[in-house]
């Protein structure tokens, strides 16, 4: 049961390797499981990340920033959406922002947080700006924010194929399609605390109920056991 990883680089070689080993099945966090299955002739199953609840939690401290972003910007990623949003952050000049962006513009310089420091950043920010990664991968940050139960996920809008039932706009996150919509929604939820926290709390409940590492391990176990029957 090989696990396909970093699907955005050397994908064809990785799929060929899985095809040659004639595995019973393969696992991946990417949503293109039908395409991978068709190419290799091997069943692919989608699994997913989670978060360490002992680290990504409510630390019992107040908020120190209104909006937080930490990550790399890549021109080829989601039509350079991160860079396009970050370049207009002056539109939120009345709010306290904490931005740790690394890109080709600054030779990818920036702070690399420890897990605990990073978790505390999430727990002290009212909104966390997140987008899908290379090849539209759903990364760990979505689950880390939900686990923390303090910050609102403000993320790029993707279809159900990508997000599945893990992320639902207006329910456990807030989605945007354009730069203008990002800023409209950021301001709205920074000025409507009750509505912001309603979504934050729902996200935490969803996480605890079905997105923890225990849930993930049970899902993987079930997949493997299905091939032993």
Question: Which functions belong to the PLM regions below?
Answer:
Residues 2-143, 147, 151-165, 213-214, ...:
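Nucleotide-sugar donor-binding catalytic core of glycosyltransferases
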Residues 145, 173, 203:
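Hydrophobic, well-ordered secondary-structure elements that form the walls
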Residues 169-170:
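Glycine-centered loop/turn motifs
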Residues 173-179, 188-193:
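Conserved acidic donor-binding segment of nucleotide-sugar-dependent glycosyltransferases
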Residues 182:
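Catalytic phosphate/metal-binding cores of nucleic-acid and nucleotide-processing enzymes, i.e., regions
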Residues 190-224:
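A charged, aromatic-enriched C-terminal amphipathic alpha-helix characteristic of glycosyltransferases
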